[in-house]
């Protein structure tokens, strides 16, 4: 929320400096993000009037102007295209100082003397508009200091509001809080009802009362939209970061900023019959004010006439029914209350974000619509003329928000704030916020909440308000005390921090990505799986809960590659969300992605790129941390996001633990990845669950090693061969490793060669050759019988 300080002080004016006001607002939870002066630093500039102009004798783009300062007439040479007799403009006389320490002196331009300068808005740093002189109102007093006339000793204050404080998205809401903070009265503009000058109405029919419990409309005839918006209103809008468009739009925006009620003005001539507030028809088309055509969904509330949709309710109006300064003569003015849930997320789902949707999503006072209607009507009549008709209202009382009283206990206040608060002070602070308190017992109140404080429904909400007004910085510091009994952790169970350190030691960097992703990205990684969609997403490309950590990691990988980071190794730990709300599983996972060279750049390091076995080694390091690496098996498998020939399924005692492999070529193409990328993802609970190591004394006796060259079927997994060897190698086997795999010349195309090293060591004696040879023969017999694997000849 951005607003003019002077506008706020017109409502409530505590006798404090700007800096003190800003600091107090921030301490009260209305955090001030920025304070921007309304104009640059300048002096000596007054309201001037151009009395006459003539063409410069030696320059086509310059004009010689006679300018009145209210006391004298000066000759000024000006190049602005809109310099003409009769307009009033900022006039910098000789001796004036413009922003940037630019001093005005007598000058001669192409042989003609100039005694001053006529200024644009950009030259005074009022705005960035630099297409001509800043034209002032016709009744601007000539000779008055321009800072005084335009109230430029002002500042734009921007507040970063939390979503629950939608009531402060207006000058009225901010004034209520400032009044309570400083115990200063609010001077609210008097808004009398405008008497009807004619009886023309357009009937209003609401077929979705739960989404729109209140709708007000009024016909205003014979308006003149060619009249300009008053400069004072344009300036207040500008300082609130709202661009002036035309009088009708400016007035509805002004009322929204002032009171907090979004409004809309339709061109009455474009409305066929009456107004219908209904749900859209699936696929119904609407061209919006920004020129974008959207296909509406059936869950979208629209304002329509008897033939077509005119606007997305609470978001944006349609182009064909919008006001036009050249052809619009009659208006239909709308002021309505839409339930936040009916508007929430709709703007983002259509790729929009408007001031109206921003307010309706957070909540608007359900009792404000009529006051806003009368305020906007009066401003329209004052500025563009016209005659107002009667107000037509459609209301469903049963669907309007019902605010229940809240019970507040002194005991709970003390417990949460760490201090006792005087009952009189409690009542005074709450009453200052227009909350009505009634004693309902000893140390207890029943508090009635006004309609504009839709964020207050619980006792803790009231205590938060007390803390805000009392001052968080004034609360005593009381450290909580608790008797804690440390809970022992099983020795067999590891922890996530150690796994994270292990991956960092292996060259990874930790990434933290959003749990919600683009539904299109979800479909790429998990085709055919129904995503869990958010009801109110941050944006349309963050609408699905992730079923894997891979989408976020791959997007982070792309981000790094786009910034010339060729060697990327990222990991993340977090939840994945599988299923729908009824059977949703939130499963802790750990995942990683790698690409680029195997080793960092260095004179002794090669430039080999990473491959499948690099990521497998990283996964084995994680699994080995548990002390139970032998419990895990790797086997060829399939995953829609992984390469069909480079995918491993990881299991533990027959239970799926995770996957690793190269990214699928089609997926890589869809994501624009032109290099090998390898991924892994593991169920965290299975990785950290291990077993205690068993102590065995180091043997003093020599090891015995045998190497076997085996011929196995092409489709026989090496893990199956190793497992069978281990089962038949006896209890003194201390090491078993596969150190070579060969396919090619001298080997049948359907077969492969595996080189395996076996090491035995007895703890109390030396093993003899007969024992080892007997064991080897048992191994070879089992391999031939069960896996058709034989010794290579």
From Swiss-Prot:
GO terms for biological process: phenylalanyl-tRNA aminoacylation. It catalyses: tRNA(Phe) + L-phenylalanine + ATP = L-phenylalanyl-tRNA(Phe) + AMP + diphosphate + H(+). GO terms for cellular component: phenylalanine-tRNA ligase complex. Residues 401-477 form the B5 domain. One of its GO terms (molecular function) is phenylalanine-tRNA ligase activity. Residues 39-147 form the tRNA-binding domain. Its main location: cytoplasm. InterPro entries: aa-tRNA-synth_II/BPL/LPL, B3/B4_tRNA-bd, DNA-bd_dom_put_sf, Fdx_antiC-bd, Fdx_antiC-bd_sf, NA-bd_OB-fold, Phe-tRNA-ligase_IIc_bsu, Phe-tRNA-ligase_IIc_bsu_bact. The keyword DNA-binding does not apply. Its cofactor is Mg(2+). Gene3D superfamilies: 3.30.56.10, Bira Bifunctional Protein, Domain 2 (3.30.930.10), Ferrodoxin-fold anticodon-binding domain (3.30.70.380), Nucleic acid-binding proteins (2.40.50.140), Phenylalanyl-trna Synthetase, Chain B, domain 3 (3.50.40.10). Mg(2+) binds at residues 455, 461, 464-465. It is found in: Cytoplasm. Keywords: Aminoacyl-tRNA synthetase, ATP-binding, Cytoplasm, Ligase, Magnesium, Metal-binding, Nucleotide-binding, Protein biosynthesis, RNA-binding, tRNA-binding. Its EC number is 6.1.1.20. Binds 2 magnesium ions per tetramer. Residues 699-792 form the FDX-ACB domain. Tetramer of two alpha and two beta subunits. PANTHER family: PHENYLALANINE--TRNA LIGASE BETA SUBUNIT (PTHR10947:SF0), PHENYLALANYL-TRNA SYNTHETASE BETA CHAIN AND LEUCINE-RICH REPEAT-CONTAINING PROTEIN 47 (PTHR10947). Belongs to the phenylalanyl-tRNA synthetase beta subunit family. Type 1 subfamily. This is Phenylalanine--tRNA ligase beta subunit. It comes from Pseudomonas putida (strain ATCC 47054 / DSM 6125 / CFBP 8728 / NCIMB 11950 / KT2440).
């Amino acid at each position: 929320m951005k607003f003019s300080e002077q506008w706020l002080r017109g409502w409530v004016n505590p006798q404090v400096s700007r800096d003190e006001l800003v600091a107090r607002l921030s301490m009260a939870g209305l955090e001030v993000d920025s304070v921007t002066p309304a104009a640059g630093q300048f002096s000596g500039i007054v309201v001037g009037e151009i009395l006459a102009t003539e063409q410069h004798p030696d320059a086509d783009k310059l004009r010689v102007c006679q300018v009145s300062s209210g006391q004298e007439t000066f000759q000024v040479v000006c190049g602005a295209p809109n310099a003409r007799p009769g307009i009033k403009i900022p006039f910098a006389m000789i001796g004036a100082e413009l922003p940037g320490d630019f001093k005005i002196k007598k000058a001669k331009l192409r042989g003609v003397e100039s005694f001053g300068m006529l200024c644009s808005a950009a030259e005074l740093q009022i705005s960035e508009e630099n297409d001509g002189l800043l034209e002032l109102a016709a009744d601007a007093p000539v000779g008055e200091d321009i800072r005084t006339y335009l109230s430029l000793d002002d500042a734009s204050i921007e507040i970063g509001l939390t979503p629950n404080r939608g009531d402060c998205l207006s000058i009225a809401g901010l004034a209520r809080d400032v009044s309570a903070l400083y115990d200063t009265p609010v001077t609210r503009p008097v808004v009398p009802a405008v008497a009807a000058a004619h009886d023309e109405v357009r009937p209003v029919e609401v077929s979705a009362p739960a989404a729109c419990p209140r709708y007000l409309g009024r016909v205003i005839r014979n308006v003149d939209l060619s009249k300009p918006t008053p400069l004072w209103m344009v300036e207040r809008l500008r300082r609130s970061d709202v661009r002036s468009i035309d009088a009708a739009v400016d007035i509805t925006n002004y009322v929204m900023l002032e009171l907090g009620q979004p409004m809309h003005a339709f061109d009455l001539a474009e409305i066929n019959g009456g107004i219908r507030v209904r749900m859209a028809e699936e696929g119904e088309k609407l061209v919006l004010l920004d020129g974008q055509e959207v296909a509406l969904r059936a869950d979208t509330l629209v304002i329509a006439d008897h033939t077509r949709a005119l606007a997305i309710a609470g978001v944006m109006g349609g182009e064909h029914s919008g006001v036009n300064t050249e052809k619009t003569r009659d208006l239909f003015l709308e002021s309505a209350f839409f339930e936040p849930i009916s508007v929430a997320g709709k703007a983002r789902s259509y790729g929009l974000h408007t001031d109206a949707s921003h307010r309706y999503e957070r909540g608007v006072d359900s009792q404000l619509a009529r006051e806003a209607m009368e305020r906007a009507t009066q401003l329209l009549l004052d500025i563009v003329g016209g005659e107002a008709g009667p107000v037509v209202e459609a209301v469903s009382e049963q669907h309007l928000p019902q605010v229940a009283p809240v019970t507040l206990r002194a005991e709970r206040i003390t417990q949460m704030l760490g201090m006792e608060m005087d009952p009189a002070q409690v009542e005074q602070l709450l009453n200052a916020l227009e909350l009505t308190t009634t004693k309902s017992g000893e140390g207890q109140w029943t508090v009635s909440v006004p309609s504009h404080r839709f964020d207050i429904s619980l006792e803790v909400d009231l205590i938060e308000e007390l803390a805000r007004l009392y001052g968080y910085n004034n609360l005593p510091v009381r450290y909580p005390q608790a008797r804690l009994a440390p809970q022992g952790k099983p020795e067999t169970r590891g922890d996530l921090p150690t796994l994270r350190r292990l991956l960092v030691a292996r060259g990874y960097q930790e990434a933290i990505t959003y749990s919600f992703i683009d539904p299109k990205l979800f479909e790429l990684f998990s085709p055919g799986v129904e995503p869990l969609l958010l009801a109110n997403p941050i944006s349309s490309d963050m609408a699905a809960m992730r079923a894997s950590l891979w989408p976020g990691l791959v997007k982070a990988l792309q981000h790094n590659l786009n910034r010339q980071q060729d060697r990327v190794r990222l990991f993340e730990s977090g939840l994945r969300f599988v299923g729908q709300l009824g059977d949703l599983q939130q499963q802790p996972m750990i995942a990683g992605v790698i690409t680029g060279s195997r080793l960092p750049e260095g004179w002794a390091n090669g430039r080999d790129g990473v491959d499948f076995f690099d990521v497998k080694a990283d996964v084995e390091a994680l699994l080995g941390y548990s002390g139970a690496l032998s419990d895990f098996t790797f086997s060829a498998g399939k995953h829609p996001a992984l390469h069909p020939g480079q995918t491993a399924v990881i299991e533990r005692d027959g239970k799926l633990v995770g996957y690793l492999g190269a990214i699928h070529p089609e997926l890589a193409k869809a994501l624009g990845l032109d290099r090998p990328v390898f991924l892994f993802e593991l169920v965290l609970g299975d990785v950290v669950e291990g077993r205690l190591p068993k102590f065995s004394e180091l043997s003093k006796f020599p090891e015995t090693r045998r190497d076997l060259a085996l011929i196995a079927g092409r489709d026989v997994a090496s893990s199956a061969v190793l497992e069978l060897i281990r089962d038949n190698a006896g209890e003194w086997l201390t090491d078993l490793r596969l150190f070579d795999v060969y396919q090619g010349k001298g080997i049948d195309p359907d077969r492969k060669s595996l080189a395996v090293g076996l090491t035995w060591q007895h703890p109390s004696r030396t093993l003899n050759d007969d024992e080892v040879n007997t064991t080897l023969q048992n191994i070879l017999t089992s391999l031939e019988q069960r896996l058709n694997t034989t010794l290579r000849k």
